[in-house]
């Protein structure tokens, strides 16, 4: 059964990643109304008779979201049953399921009633939490903690501050990026790093949305760089923290490069999807570090208790 659960966890993680990228594809191609205002039917039909490209994209996104719902539900039930001895299992299972349902309902509401771009931007963030929760659940199932000796990890307050701070802030950056997509502001500023050679400062809403995201992205790049330097200096003996921050910096660097290329490739589809891919992976890594941070306090108390007993 454990082998089956491992396969299920991997397939579920991949399916949720496809859901995230599919949502970005729907937004990028303007396929949100590919099935009209019908939900769960498509243009009022179970199998649509007229298949335009927008209909195929929207319908594919609905199908992958539906399969993800089934897989996540099954994974939550089995992990709850067979891995309940691991402290975070129940919490992650609940988060995975609740946020997947929330993003499905929000997607359905957007189709039937429509939503403002500021509200639609939350949709990606909700999906991202479900994806990260399933990734963490998968890590627990594969016992990644034991391989990195993460269960005995103790971090100082400074490192935990950076972990929690960067993760929360990354969610804000994700929202600003999703808002750029939904406001159709990807090409509002044709130059980089400033908005335009003729007008360095933004003058209208779409330009402010674009430049706001750029500033937020630059700040998270600098913050992760600083945290990585701290990890390299002080956590070489803790490989999970050491490599966690190095991987985070690699991902945020790739994210920044692709973000710049989005501007200079006229917002090409491949660059837009890579942009969504890298931020999804980065958020999952940061959430894993958050989980380690919550354990650190427990580990410190246990170490102090053992120390008192030995005295």
From Swiss-Prot:
Molecular function GO labels: metal ion binding; oxidoreductase activity, acting on NAD(P)H, heme protein as acceptor
Keyword Transmembrane helix listed: yes
Positions on the Cytoplasmic side per record topology: 1-6, 84-91, 143-159, 233-243, 293-311
Compartments, as annotated in UniProt: Cell membrane
Positions bound to heme o: 61, 123
Cofactor(s) listed in the protein's UniProt record: heme b
Pathway assigned to this chain's UniProt record: Porphyrin-containing compound metabolism; heme A biosynthesis; heme A from heme O: step 1/1
Catalytic activity: Fe(II)-heme o + 2 A + H2O = Fe(II)-heme a + 2 AH2
Keywords assigned: Cell membrane, Disulfide bond, Heme biosynthesis, Iron, Membrane, Metal-binding, Oxidoreductase, Transmembrane, Transmembrane helix
Membrane topology listed for this record: Multi-pass membrane protein
Alphabetical list of InterPro entries matching this protein: COX15/CtaA_fam (IPR003780), COX15/CtaA_HemeA_synthase (IPR050450), HemeA_Synthase_type1 (IPR023755)
Keyword Phosphoprotein in annotation: no
Domain writeup: The N-half (TM1-TM4) and C-half (TM5-TM8) domains are connected by an intracellular loop. Each domain is formed from four-helix bundles and they align in a pseudo twofold symmetry manner. The N-half domain is the substrate-heme O binding domain and the C-half domain is the cofactor heme B binding domain. The cysteines of disulfide bond Cys-35 and Cys-42 may be involved in transfer of reducing equivalents from quinol in the membrane to the active site of the enzyme.
UniProt function note: Catalyzes the conversion of heme O to heme A by two successive hydroxylations of the methyl group at C8. The first hydroxylation forms heme I, the second hydroxylation results in an unstable dihydroxymethyl group, which spontaneously dehydrates, resulting in the formyl group of heme A.
Subunit structure: Interacts with CtaB.
Protein family according to the UniProt entry: Belongs to the COX15/CtaA family. Type 1 subfamily.
This protein's name: Heme A synthase
Annotated gene: ctaA
